[in-house]
């Protein structure tokens, strides 16, 4: 029972990693409250944590030298919760603005640790299974907090931020059930000044490029599917929302299927899932009816979850314990870069054509090519 609770507590850390955008449904109320402030500045509050996440990831190596993994996790969980209470205490725009940056930094502290702690504490098949379930936990967490916002918003937009108080029970679970003895502290101290070799840097950077491409494609799908739904099936925003929700929830199945897929494809899983992901994007671009569009979009969500989890699994396989946290932070930084680059890529492609066949044709072919690059990285680093 103790081991089960330890695993549940570790997986709970991933429950809140992708919840920065959960308060987006409170934007309308925030527009009304902050009259005189441009809507673009209010919308910025939703995406602002991404900047804080980037700061934490960039300085992760130096932060890791000053603080233990346990200190970073506890600090991240406490800051995460406090930033949820700040709008209630002071809803002034500059205060909320600063709190969202700090919120992002807290998520950044948790992001690397939540992934690395699994690779450090579990080995073999158990590690693969746990990494897969970790991806499912992210999906469930985002859905639960988004639903929580919809319930709290009736009490005012400030109350919607209280969903971030979920980190308090997660903190208690972590402190109660995840052991941190003198042996763990000694291992961390031993690895604190270990530096990555040139080969390890190349592997981590290569996988960061793969992760960036995977996330770039996912955000492109999320942003463009509503307009494609209208063009292809004369659907509504509600229809697009249902398709995108299904695309997210299929990530739960992908997480549960990850271990069997790893056993089946072994070191080829990254290229198999990446090529499948690219093909689904090509099919999105040429979909002629709503049913076909819905099916291939949901399949894209499955392939996306498998491909991204595979990146972290490869890192766990290839990187020694002393540099795993730093290598993971590089890969997560790649994910953030891919997300941020989406707007610029779509704008650039839009200067040529905004047709779905062109947009998703580009992203699909890019994903397939990057998948073979990923296979080369995996096999080269495995020698």
Briefly describe each language-model feature range:
Residues 83, 94-102, 291-299:
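Paired small-residue
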Residues 56-68, 254-266, 350:
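Helix-to-loop junctions at the C-terminal end of transmembrane segments
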